[in-house]
Structures are given as structure tokens and as C-alpha cells.
Regions:
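Charged, amphipathic alpha-helical coiled-coil/dimerization segments
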Residues: 73-130
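Residues in the recognition helix of alpha-helical DNA-binding motifs
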Residues: 70
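N-terminal leader segment of winged-helix/HTH proteins
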Residues: 1-32
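Short, flexible helix-adjacent loops and helix caps
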Residues: 24-31, 85, 116-119, 140
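N-terminal helix-turn-helix DNA-binding core of bacterial DNA-binding proteins
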Residues: 21-63
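A structural signal for well-ordered alpha-helices, especially hydrophobic packing surfaces
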Residues: 16, 20-23, 104, 132, ...
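Generic structural concept
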Residues: 9, 13-16, 42, 97, ...
Length: 140
């Protein structure tokens, strides 16, 4: 692979990883992996009135133990509520609380700002490359 092509592929791969990280709620200042799963659970619960742990597990592809631990923490934090089925106390459901809705809105706002920054970077990338090449030519 030629030098310029290789550099462009590296750049595209780098941008793809950064966008994927943004989509997953990854934040460079807080590398806590729970953010991604928390965001996904809150987003799923915002779409429905309530979901069972099995539905959350199926929708998000998380392990049963991870769903249990994560939802337990979100209940403790007041971001989701746990309720039991009226006719069968063994069946539980989770629903998003107003605090959870506010947290999700904040996460979505941050994600939107991050997307805007990334898109501005992507749109300006050709100008950045051109300027870097001109600077390299001056230094030679």
C-alpha cells in the first residue's frame, strides 16, 4: 500500500473508532465502561413504559449478571425504578424515572456536541492535511 493511501486509511480508521466511541458514550475524561451500558439501558427504557430484565438482556446483548448489576446500581441512583407484576410477584420490570430521563437527556446532549465536533473535524480534515503538507514543504 502506498504511503498516502496508508495514511488516509489510518485516518479513516481513527475517525471510525472515535465515532464508535462517541456512539457508545465513551468519554476521554471518564473512561468508565459502565457509561456505555448505562446509556443503552436508559435509552431502551425511554422507549417503553417498562421492560423486564430478560427484555433488556435480549435488546442490548448483555449478560444476565451484567443486567442485574447495572440495573441494581441504576435503581440505587434513582435513575430507574423496579416494580413487580401485579399478578405474579416473581416477575419484575424496570422503568425510567424523571432523574433517569434527565441523565439520558444530558448524555444525548453531550453526544450531539461530540458528533458536531467530530463532523467539524472531518469536514475540515482536507484543509488540515493541505496545511500540514504546506508546512512540511516550508520546513524542507
Amino acid at each position: 500500500m502506498e504511503g498516502q493511501d496508508f495514511e488516509e486509511i489510518k485516518t479513516i480508521a481513527s475517525l471510525a473508532m472515535r465515532l464508535q466511541n462517541l456512539c457508545e458514550g465513551f468519554d476521554e475524561t471518564n473512561k468508565n465502561a459502565i457509561i456505555s451500558a448505562k446509556f443503552k439501558v436508559l435509552l431502551e427504557l425511554s422507549k417503553k413504559d417498562k421492560l423486564s430484565p430478560a427484555e433488556i438482556k435480549q435488546n442490548l446483548g448483555l449478560a444476565k449478571s451484567n443486567v442485574s448489576n447495572l440495573c441494581g446500581r441504576l435503581v440505587e441512583d434513582g435513575e430507574i425504578a423496579k416494580s413487580k407484576e401485579k399478578f405474579d410477584n416473581r416477575t419484575i420490570f424496570y422503568s425510567i424515572t424523571p432523574l433517569g430521563e434527565a441523565e439520558l437527556a444530558d448524555m444525548l446532549d453531550k453526544m450531539q456536541k461530540n458528533f458536531k465536533t467530530e463532523l467539524e473535524y472531518k469536514n475540515n480534515f482536507p484543509k488540515i492535511v493541505k496545511s500540514a503538507r504546506e508546512l512540511a514543504d516550508l520546513v524542507k
